[in-house]
């Protein structure tokens, strides 16, 4: 019998008071940091896969064990779905497969975003499914929307638009903050409860089985 998952506990019950300040500062500054060698090596795997079979891309950032990446490949059969996670331990739990419709990379997500932008590679769909919520108020800048790499996320589709982005979390505040950050960047979208359906990730299944409310932000690119 599985132990129920705990709800997110935070000393920040509402939107962070410095959210707009932090997001706007990052949007003005942009982002450029040295890419870690292991991330650069992982990106070469992606370039090789595209050279062998050119396809549009779907990105599954913070993919964990890659369960979601395989599921997304079934949803996007005309794309190469790329799952990225920094943890070799988590990725090692993915069942061995000879699948060619998805690729798992051990790399820092911000590094991969930076390399995609630098190489002019666009992403049609970008999924951020249950990233670490960093629930302490002091950790705002560790959250996706509070991190310095947030501007890269906005440049991952053709024409410099963010493509179709979907973020899910079991912490409503996190999703609402992400939605506001996207709005500040000029990208329309909506926040809503996630409707019932097959779980895309193992966390999603566990949270739903534990009775958590699940939340989703979705954005449609303006082509």
Predicted regions and their residues:
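A short glycine-rich, Lys/Arg-flanked "PGG" loop and its adjoining helix->strand segment in the class I
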Residues: 145-160
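Conserved beta-strand/loop positions that form the S-adenosyl-L-methionine
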Residues: 61, 84
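Conserved SAM/SAH-binding beta-strand->alpha-helix loop
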Residues: 87
